């Protein structure tokens, strides 16, 4: 799984870096030629895109390193650390755009050669849509947190490029403050996206449980298995591509140890079929020794 995961995520990061680098050069020329603060916003965002995508590429390769003596659970948390760092950089760029927008709102300046800005923005819009489509496919295949964060950022770029088109069109017809107003809006949206990304990264670092639907899938597998009288203490978390799942199964007091082991092993394999590559730990308890306070999500 890790080889396929690493290959797909690396391709997504390389594609994002290449596209952002090409668009950066185009936007530098367009900003110099038009003086548009909205294009400046897009230019700064492309710089952030390059940094984020390069970081994702390096971090994914590091996070896929096998566990060692000092990191017995692997290196998957590196993805969350990278996402947290990216959110800080993106917040700084959003603040810069916001302040620049205020400056141009107070002292608006007419745009030069707005048509060039429209062409550049259209190129950026089409390119970003293609990248987001590819990233969405990779996320569906890998569930990578790094690519999902990158995809959300590029989705905001699609919205930003659409807003820039509107701003340039309005400025063309004399609404010179529209450019600054849209820059302010873009800055606010980027800040919101950065804070959301940072929140998700912190939750991952704090070992937030798997989503409700995934935990429910685990419960469904366990409750359907014959020979299990109950279950409790379901604990889950995720680190990079790996899910960690722990659960206690309650069985008949007189069940032979070998048979209890076979049942637990069958349940483990069923969970792994649903969540390939997971780290599953199952503890078997005699049902009579489980205190009522510990009885969990079902009892037969």
Swiss-Prot record:
One of its GO terms (molecular function) is ferrous iron transmembrane transporter activity. Its main location: membrane. It catalyses: Zn(2+)(in) + H(+)(out) = Zn(2+)(out) + H(+)(in); Cd(2+)(in) + H(+)(out) = Cd(2+)(out) + H(+)(in); Fe(2+)(in) + H(+)(out) = Fe(2+)(out) + H(+)(in). The keyword Cell division does not apply. The chain crosses the membrane at residues 24-44, 82-102, 114-134, 156-176, 178-198. InterPro entries: Cation_efflux (IPR002524), Cation_efflux_CTD (IPR027470), Cation_efflux_CTD_sf (IPR036837), Cation_efflux_FieF (IPR023783), Cation_efflux_TMD_sf (IPR027469), CDF_Transporter (IPR050291). Zn(2+) binds at residues 45, 49, 153, 157. It is found in: Cell inner membrane. One of its GO terms (biological process) is intracellular zinc ion homeostasis. Keywords: Cell inner membrane, Cell membrane, Ion transport, Iron, Iron transport, Membrane, Metal-binding, Transmembrane, Transmembrane helix, Transport, Zinc, Zinc transport. It is a multi-pass membrane protein. GO terms for cellular component: plasma membrane. It comes from the Bacteria. The keyword NAD does not apply. Homodimer. Belongs to the cation diffusion facilitator (CDF) transporter (TC 2.A.4) family. FieF subfamily. PANTHER family: CATION-EFFLUX PUMP FIEF, MITOCHONDRIAL METAL TRANSPORTER 1-RELATED. Divalent metal cation transporter which exports Zn(2+), Cd(2+) and possibly Fe(2+). May be involved in zinc and iron detoxification by efflux. This is Cation-efflux pump FieF. It comes from Klebsiella pneumoniae subsp. pneumoniae (strain ATCC 700721 / MGH 78578). The gene is fieF.
